[in-house]
């Protein structure tokens, strides 16, 4: 079992951290994030690093310990570097376009699908078959990218649909052309 919760979280230069009870606020060059954590977790900040401590070795507290540490680390990485997910559209006539803040997808339905990104999410469309979702909140970026993918998930026969750029689609063989019924 990993002991990730015990590792201190280094705070880089230019990042401001405020810990008030169970609420942690992180401000950095890309923006600021605030999150409420479980009341059992003790979070301390000594100027250069953040430490997360658990009250006991119960299973629930062990799980929360690692989770809390990782969430705080994700906040720090988000406000310094940000997060991004890239998707690609595979299929004839499948394309994405940006209209103002909206994302418009043409993916084989009788109508174009319009999507409004949540606050704090930025969308780029470098090519008509590529979408890049950017933001400082890892959870929001992942959720919105998954929502886009869910509009037309890749199918296993031809691979048509919206997929993550690094995703590998498991393909299936089609029906073999045998003799038909008479």
From Swiss-Prot:
A GO biological-process term: cytoplasmic translation
What's a Pfam family in this record?
Ribosomal_L6
Q: Which GO molecular function terms does the record list?
A: rRNA binding; structural constituent of ribosome
Keywords linked to the UniProt accession: Ribonucleoprotein, Ribosomal protein, RNA-binding, rRNA-binding
Write down the InterPro entries for this protein, in alphabetical order. Ribosomal_uL6-like, Ribosomal_uL6-like_a/b-dom_sf, Ribosomal_uL6_a/b-dom, Ribosomal_uL6_bac-type, Ribosomal_uL6_CS
Identify the GO cellular component terms for this protein.
cytosolic large ribosomal subunit
- What is known about what this protein does? This protein binds to the 23S rRNA, and is important in its secondary structure. It is located near the subunit interface in the base of the L7/L12 stalk, and near the tRNA binding site of the peptidyltransferase center.
Which family would the database say this protein is a member of?
Answer: Belongs to the universal ribosomal protein uL6 family.
Subunit and interaction comment: Part of the 50S ribosomal subunit.
Q: What is this protein called?
A: Large ribosomal subunit protein uL6
Species this protein is from: Carboxydothermus hydrogenoformans (strain ATCC BAA-161 / DSM 6008 / Z-2901)
Q: Gene name?
A: rplF
